[in-house]
Structures are given as C-alpha cells and as structure tokens.
Amino acid sequence: MVCVACVEENKGCECEHEKPVRELVLEAASENSSFLHSVINMVGMLIGLGQLSMPYAVESGGWMSIFLLISFGILTTYTSHILGKCIRRNPKSKSYSDIGYSAFGRHGRLIVCLFIYLEIFMALVSYTISLHDNISAAFPATFSNHGHFPAAKLTAVAVAIALPSLWIRDLSSISFLSSGGILMSAIIFGSVVYTAIFGGVIDDGKIPVLRLENIPTVSGIYLFSFGGHIVFPNLYTSMKDPSKFTKVSIVSFATVTALYGALAITGAKMFGPSVNSQITLSLPKHLVVTKIALWATVLTPMTKYALEFAPLAIQLERSLPSTMTDRTKLVARGLMGSALLLVILALALTVPYFGYVLSLTGSLVSVTIAVTLPSAFYLKICWDGMTKFTRAANLGFVVLGCVLGVLGSFESSKLLVKELVRVHGG
C-alpha cells in the first residue's frame, strides 16, 4: 500500500517502511509466486468477515439474491482482470494507488489513499463488533443474568490485550497472522457443514424468492465480500508469470464464490428467517464445533488489529517531525494507535449492528474500490485500445457502482439510525 506522505511524489511509494507492509499483505515479496501460490494469496485476501453474513444476506434478499452474489463475483473478477491490463499498459505501476496516479495524477492517488484508510477504519469497527458478539456467545452463562454491560467489559479486555501489538514497529515477526482468514473460513465452513449433517437443525420458516426492497443493503454485503482489489496489483507484480493473472483471478473468485454460495444456501436453509447476521451466532450452542467456530471468530479480530492498522501507523509516524528520535516516534505511534483503537471500540459498542455496518462499508467503500475505480482507471488508461462495446460496458460499470454506492449507503444508514432510535428510545 502507498502512504499519503508519498502522494506528492510523481512516482510509486518505495519508502523503506513499505516493504514490511507489503509482505504482510502478500507473502510473496519477490517476483517468484507460482500460479498456485498466487491463487492462495488472492483467496486469502478475499475471504474475511463477509462470509459470516452470507446466510443472512440470502434471508434478507431472498433466494434469488444468490444470482446477485454470482453476478458480483463475475463483475469483480472482471475488474480484477482490468487492473492487470492497466499495469501492463504502464509497467511502472506497482500498486493500486500507482494505477490511480497513472489514471488521474496526484488527485487519483490521494482519492485512493483516502478510500484505503476509510476501508481500514470501517473494517476494524466491523471486526470489533464481531468480537463483541461472538465473545458474548462464547460465554453465555456469564452474561445471561447481567445484561449488555459485562459483555462490553470483556470486549474491552480483549481489545486491551491486543493493544500492545500496535506498538510493534517491525510487523514481519507476526506476518503469519495474515493467513488467519483462510483458517477461520475453513473452521466456519466445516462447522456449518457439520451442523447441517449431524446437528439436527430443522427450521420450518420460509424464505421468500425475492425481497426487492432489501437488495441495496444485500448488495453492500456481497460487494464487501469481494473487495480485495487494493492488493491485487501487488499480487500481479509478485507473480513469476504475470500473464496468468487473469486465470488466477478466475480460479480465485470462482473458489470464493462457490464457498460463499455453499455457506449462504446451507445456513439459510438450516435457520431460515431466524438466521443471525453472523452465522456463528446461529449454530447450536451445545455443539463442540460451535465453540470452536466462536473462538476462531473471537481470536481473528485480535490478530488483525496490528496488521490492519499498519498502513495508518506508518502514515502517522511519517507525519511526525523529523527531529523526533526513533524512540519518541515509537511512543507517539503507539499512543495514537491505542487512542484510535479505543475510539473504534467505543464506536463498535455504540453501534453493535454487524450486518448494517458491513453493508454500509460495502456500499460506501468496497463498491468504489472493487467496481467504480477499476473501471474508471481502465477507461482513462486504455481508452484508445478499447472497442465501443468495452467502453460502453465500463462506463456502465462506473454508473452501476455509483448507483449501488448511493442507494446502499442511504439504506444502510437509514436502518442503522432506525435501530439506534429503537434501542435507545429516541
């Protein structure tokens, strides 16, 4: 990722601090990633919090929304492909923000950086909400007679345990945590499949074919789940044979879409209208696999804080006066990071509505990063070599991204406000 401090440079960000962050995002820092390794990296970047809400999204949008999931999978595969074409047109582009600069100059890079940081912030809020919800479910006896406050206290304790990780400057020592998404996905998928086969769960509730009024918010959840495009240019440049990048995208997105579809259908079929916005919270509490899934979902946010915060921390440190010593910068970075995480904790406890926040993030940020900007970059960089159909299609994708972003953000925000008013009696 690029830092905002380098936005004013007429080149990609090649600062010394950049290498560790890229290594955290992609394990292949050199141009030596095989096809299989690249697929694993891309799948790992795509799979995340979104998988928890797949059954909920189907319940909200109806069974027909599965086709929307598949359509977005195809669309975001295409936008991944055209990011590769943008890099081939300008080989100096090494990152998503470099492509933004190649297309729209300094303003393009600045816009990209702002969206990167906004996505990081909102993702951290979502992770913390997930931590709170699942840690409450992991200790049901503890909170059954004491209301919401004890759960909030334990969430605060969990965040406090993770706070010291924000003070680590060299994150390469914990880069193995970046593979946690794939492990969590395997555990959750295994738990859902086990419950479907052996759990004896039967739900008589009916899910409608289509709920058109919920499509904007459901679209946000689906798009959030396909939004890994920020690191795809780095993955492209790390490949031994970049000409296979499109095939990597097709295999990776097909794998993830199949996983999401299986989770969505299985979870929605088992729990029907009673399904929670996080599938782990709907699994039978007495099953051992449920406890494993809950703890996997609890531990994942705690391991993500340092990794997700790294780009923000780097920018904060670079913004400090050069006269400061390294020790003073480390302390300032740690204090600012801790303060930001406490703000995120407060926000997550104030607005603990995972599904709505995830939908808002997808509509406000992910659709821009995964659909609107890639098509806009492609139009600007490769306009001369496009057919009329390709130009029209990508112009349509830009418009579609803007429409989905506006409608989804409005609907998600409206639902959030409505829920807050209902809960707090305003």
From Swiss-Prot:
Organism for this UniProt entry: Arabidopsis thaliana (Mouse-ear cress)
One Gene Ontology term from the biological process aspect of the record: amino acid transport
Keyword match Transmembrane: yes
Domain of life according to the entry: Eukaryota
Similarity remark: Belongs to the amino acid/polyamine transporter 2 family. Amino acid/auxin permease (AAAP) (TC 2.A.18.5) subfamily.
Compartment(s) of residence: Membrane
Protein name, as recorded: Amino acid transporter AVT1H
Membrane topology, as annotated: Multi-pass membrane protein
Transmembrane segments: 34-54, 55-75, 110-130, 148-168, 182-202, 215-235, 248-268, 292-312, 340-360, 363-383, 392-412
Predominant localisation class: membrane
Keywords: Amino-acid transport, Membrane, Transmembrane, Transmembrane helix, Transport
An annotated GO cellular component: organelle membrane
